[in-house]
């Protein structure tokens, strides 16, 4: 089966987002299903580096990568982003037509114009396409106040979005909340919209010892609450900062570490400085190879979303937190995918956005009940290994791809191994330079994230 994946960003971009997610999916597919021949059409740009340019062609993981020399949408004006997105979509369509016939095209939503390219390519060649909705626009732009809800451009974009979804052979979304939203708002039959989670890398991200290099480098002691990832406008940071202010006087051992960058970084830094929230530390992104060490540095990891964003996206960082074997505290609505997994797997606590008292209470509870935090962390890793590894996700994609392309599905090269988390509630922490250590789930100083 010949498959072409089209996305603006791809390997070696390792700064998160759809490029990194699709790179990991491609590697997992090529490893377990070598009969799948994959080409990738992407850009020469890196997501967080405006100046860097990659080579126009590369081979990686037995995959051909074709990079288009198109302008980067970046973080400029809405008009500039729309024009850059349109140029990439048109260039991708031209490239598709020069590469020969494929059995299937797989596209994401970076940029949203890719669906137009895939739809046109299907019309010209009868090639089916899978439409993976990572972030749903224009709905997300409307919720963030970028586009007026009833403007002519919004209505036009919604009509296009509905057409692209209808023409796709399958729409793939990241969670049940997204499936419910898409079927309701765009009138699609439930069987046309399939849920496949993002998944996490259970090999690169492990339940490491709490004695991390990150903690040592930043002199972090006590109970560490960590947020790592994009400081985007659709994340609820004010609730986190308000909770930090409340805990400043009552729980002096609690430290908040916010690692990343994005649209809200200046706002966060301004509040921390002006309001003297001294228990909050704001740090830049860490390299990918240090990410597992970062996640192991916290006793609790945070997931946030602004109200109304459920159904439009699912934070990918959540699955990395599961892989780290740490509990999650999430300020999200109860019907979001994150909240559902937390409840189903008993691997964290959820409160609605703006619930400062609830967030303070949740963090204080886990601070004073480390055995419960340890149990939740154990459950998190167990859930990841049983349901949400990259290999599990690749298997779901492979079956869907074969159905859409009308190809015979072959077994994976290696069967999916059962969970390596032992059934006795013991996680094995890997410590750099030392032998692995068994830590009972009931111990009092375990599972710091």
Which residues does each PLM region occupy?
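N-terminal subdomain of nucleotide-sugar transferases
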Residues: 1-61, 247, 425-430, 443-449
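Carbohydrate-associated surface elements
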Residues: 44, 177, 199
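Acidic anion/phosphate-binding donor-loop and adjacent secondary structure
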Residues: 53, 183-184, 190-192, 199-216, ...
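Membrane-proximal helix-turn-helix segments that form the acceptor-binding/catalytic region
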Residues: 116, 120-124, 151-171
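Conserved donor-binding/catalytic core segment of Leloir-type glycosyltransferases
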Residues: 217-235, 241-244
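Nucleotide-sugar-dependent
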Residues: 235, 287-296, 301-322, 327-340
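Nucleotide-activated donor-binding/catalytic signature segment of Leloir-type glycosyltransferases, i.e.
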Residues: 259-260, 265-292
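A short, well-ordered alpha-helix in the C-terminal region of glycosyltransferases
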Residues: 358, 365, 372-387
